[in-house]
Structures are given as structure tokens and as C-alpha cells.
């Protein structure tokens, strides 16, 4: 309840109802509710409880020294939870001359981001004369942590699946940084790679820092792709084996290390483009499906 005064001795009570979005993280949130009545103004501190931590879940392995702060197991509903994710949409080539049109979950009656039996399927499909697909991002962002996803990659020349990160406060590429945890292109099947991009190191000038490995079952079995990101280094892993490492040169120069700000996670399946379509595309591979079992985020205790 809130009370306001209207003249001498006149006090009126009003009930105020505040609606907020669910807290999908494992950390409480602090905020304020400001109540105004005429010239009167009251600020009320509020705390939103954290989501209960599933620390007792035997299926979640927590890296030593870390704690779970966010996860998506894709075990509820038939489409991604829009309290945790949002779609990027459009057909502008995305700076890579990609051929697909990204949509918000569906194209007409076709469901292109579908959850079934605990698996999210991102589907690239030709409908009419256009290939449609999905690009989705977490609403949360994090500075440092251990990030992992269990993925099965699509088949076919022209496919370009990715699991990556971009800065929350993005102004320019590559100055603000990019972290590619996992990428693969269909014409080079089962070769998975990781990379970072920044002003000093990026593919446009041939200086990108990258690592690659051959994973013969990348398109037929699920594998765990992970990133450990600290103030000192960026490391990626496939099934616990290190794939790539990039160290902070400690020069205090964002041209070589812009990775000291919050980044958010991205999942997408591109079709064609400068890399994905470098050897052409094979439309007989469509529809192509990129499968995601889970996405988890851990931060140091």
C-alpha cells in the first residue's frame, strides 16, 4: 500500500501492483519501485528472488571452482522460452553475404525452432524461393565464465552452424570483439573450429586467431563444445579436450583484448555466405537441422 496526502490531515491509501518479468538467472536482482502522486514521490527498494539452483541435478556436471548461473535444457514447451531468448530476424546477408532469411521461430505454418524430447532443432528450409532459418540470442549476458552446449551439427554443402558470443554493448565490428566457440561449414564436414575477432585480429585482414580439429562424428552424434573465458585467457574445448587458446597480452589495449565486458550467447544456422557458401550450396541438403541438447553458463564461485 502507499499513502498520499491531499491537504491538511487528508491521507488516502492506494494499493499499487507491480508486474515484473520472471528472473531466469540464479542470482537475485535489486531494484527500486518509484511511486508518484502529484508532487509526492516515494522510492521503495525491492529484491527479486533468484531462480532455484538445480545443484542437486545429477545430470549437470559443474566445472571445478564454478557454479551454475544460467541454463536452458529445452525440456519444456515446443519452442524456445522467450523469457530467456530472442530472435534476430531479416535477410540482409549479416555482413557475410548469407543467403537465408532469419525468422522468429516460424515461417507461416512451418516451425523452424522446435523442441521435442528435450532437444531444440534449428531448421533451415526452402519455402517457395527463399531459404528460412533461425538466429537466436540469450537475453542475459555475462562477463567471464564457463559456457557449454551439447550439439549435433547439420549435414550438407551450404550449412554453416555456429555457437558464439557478441558484446552486449555493441557499437562496431570487430572493435568490440567476437568469440566463436564452435563453427563448421558443410563442405568441410566434421572440421569444427573456434576463433576470436577484434580490431587487431580478424578474418577481414587475415589475422584472425583460430583453431580447428577433425571430429568424425560431429554431424551424426552429440558433442559438448565449451568456452572458458577469464581476464587472462580464452580457451575452447570439444568433449573436454582443448581446441583453441588466446591469451590476454595485458597491454591494456582493446585493439587486442576487448574481452572485458559482458557478452551474450548466440545460436544460428546460416545458409551459404562468404564461408558457408565458398564452394557453392547444395539445396538437396535442405531441410537441414542443427540440434541443441542444452546450453549452460557457469561462473566462478
Q: Language-model features: where?
A:
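Single conserved hydrophobic/aromatic residue that forms the stacking wall/gate
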Residues: 1-12
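Strand-loop-strand motifs at the edges of beta-sheets in extracellular beta-sandwich domains
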Residues: 13-21
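A short beta-strand micro-motif common to beta-rich folds, especially ectodomain repeats
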Residues: 27-38
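Interdomain boundary/hinge segments at the C-termini of tandem beta-sandwich modules
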Residues: 46-52
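GH16 jelly-roll
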Residues: 52-301
